[in-house]
């Protein structure tokens, strides 16, 4: 028995579709049987309200006492909270403990390695990489900038000073530059110069304060719609009647627009 925990069926579906050792998939997709007789059991708990992490944490705390067929063998994590598990005894060195080789890992992106490494030890690996991007509404870009051409829009938004200038121009025409408070957060937080925690000291990187300053300015001047990531207003702003210039996404986010 191989137990794999996920928060949706993305990894499960790719495993079932492309792993050459798959022999049979249960009608309800709860298990996958491999050609060597191994049964892969899938446990899927949705992300909402921290549900996935809560249930995963509870199960991991019971690992030592769990029956062999109930122990978690593989679990998926997101970059936002990967280090919580990487920096724990619940994860293994993928080379020395699991047996992956340098050749197995040679094509990984460095940033996907870094997020699952601690003290030089890699304790996970990624099956996907989703770079960040800024998706904009072409009709609004054309109204504000006079063009919807991606190269020209990119040039107009190529640094924060330019981005802020366009936000002012968009507001003058009745648009919001961003939907909410945390839309730009990852652009700043993913470019910090040092970790949040140093020993027992919490450090707030200057780049985080730049995000705070920008968010306050956008809120005070009406450049955002005062939404929060994933809430109903944020979702509506992406709809056909939305008045928001654009959204910071990863590549998978495009599918939800």
State the predicted function of each range:
Residues 2, 36-40, 68-73, 121-122, ...:
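Loop/turn elements at helix/coil->beta-strand transitions in domains of secreted/extracellular proteins
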Residues 14-17, 85-90, 146, 190:
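Short, solvent-exposed loop/turn and secondary-structure capping segments
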Residues 7-8, 77-81, 130, 181-184, ...:
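Beta->alpha turn/N-cap motifs
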Residues 12, 16, 20-21, 213-257:
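Extracytoplasmic/periplasmic substrate-binding proteins
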Residues 95-106, 113-184, 196-229:
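Helix-loop-helix "hinge/cap" segment bordering the ligand-binding cleft or interdomain interface
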Residues 49-92, 105-124, 161-173, 236-238, ...:
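Pocket-flanking alpha-helical
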Residues 27-51, 67, 147-153, 200, ...:
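A local structural motif
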Residues 1-83, 102:
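Conserved N-terminal structural module of periplasmic/extracytoplasmic solute-binding proteins
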